[in-house]
Amino acid sequence: MKKNKLVLMLLMAAFMMIAAACGNAGESKKSNSDSAKGEEKASGSLTISGSSAMQPLVLAAAEKFMEENPDADIQVQAGGSGTGLSQVSEGAVQIGNSDVFAEEKEGIDAKALVDHQVAVVGMAAAVNPDAGVKDISKDELKKIFTGKIKNWKELGGKDQKITLVNRPDSSGTRATFVKYALDGAEPAEGITEDSSNTVKKIIADTPGAIGYLAFSYLTDDKVTALSIDGVKPEAKNVATGEYPIWAYQHSYTKGEATGLAKEFLDYLKSEDIQKSIVTDQGYIPVTDMKVTRDANGKQS
C-alpha cells in the first residue's frame, strides 16, 4: 500500500513539473513574440521636397533613419518652399518642406495641409570675405539690397563694387529675408540662383558679392555672415528674438500624417534628433525658442 502511494506521489510530482515547463515555454514564446513586435522596423517609400534651407537637416535625419530602418527608402529633393507646398498640395509628394507658413503662399489651400514645425533656422546676409565688412546696420543692409549703396567703401570696406546674389520668388529663404531683414523692400536686380549651395559658391568666388543663406550653410569661412546692429547671427540670439532673421522649418502633409511619413516626422521631432542632428546641422530646436511668431510675422 505504501509502495503504491509512493508511486502515485512521484507521478503527481512529475506531472506538475511538466505542466510548469509547458507554462514557462508558453511565456517565453509570448515574450519573444512581444519583443519581435517591439523591434519592428519602418518600411516603405517616402518622397519629400521643398525648402533648400531645410535640406541639410532633412537629408541628415533621413540618412540616419534609413540606417536604423533598412527597408525604408526616403528621397529628399529641394526646389524651394513654393515647390514643396505645391507638390504636397497636389499629392505629388508626401511631405512638403517650407520656410514660410502655407498661408503666406498664394494659390495654396493652407486649410488642407497640416503643419509640422520640426525646427527653427536663422538666416544671415553673407558676403565675400574680401569685402572688409563684418557688421552693418539694418538700414545699411536695406540700402545695399535696394541698390542705394553700391560699393563696400561706402561702409568702410574695400573699394569693390557690390554684387547682389538673390534667390527666386518661389524661395522661402528669400521671402523670410525680405520680410525680416529688408522690412518688405524688394531687392534690386542681381544674380538669381535657385540653390543655396550655388548661392554660397557664387558669393565665395565673386569679389564684392553679397547674398543670404541659412545658418546651416554657414559652417566654414568661405563666406562671412554679417552681424546686424552689433547682433551676431547665432542660435542663442535667434532663440531670444534679439536676432530678427529666422523662420520655422515647416514640414507639411496633406491631411494628418500617416504611415512612413508619420514615423519619419515623429523621428525628426524626437528629443534625440532635436538635441543631436538638429543642433549639429546649425538649426535650433523649437523647444529652445523663447519667442514665437505667427503667419503674419507677429512676434511674442
Swiss-Prot record:
It is a lipid-anchor. Keywords: Cell membrane, Lipoprotein, Membrane, Palmitate, Phosphate transport, Signal, Transport. Pfam families: PBP_like_2. One of its GO terms (cellular component) is plasma membrane. GO terms for molecular function: phosphate ion binding. The keyword Ion transport does not apply. PROSITE patterns: PROKAR_LIPOPROTEIN (PS51257). The complex is composed of two ATP-binding proteins (PstB), two transmembrane proteins (PstC and PstA) and a solute-binding protein (PstS). PANTHER family: PERIPLASMIC PHOSPHATE BINDING COMPONENT OF PHOSPHATE ABC TRANSPORTER, PHOSPHATE-BINDING PROTEIN PSTS 1. Part of the ABC transporter complex PstSACB involved in phosphate import. NCBIfam families: ptsS_2. This is Phosphate-binding protein PstS.
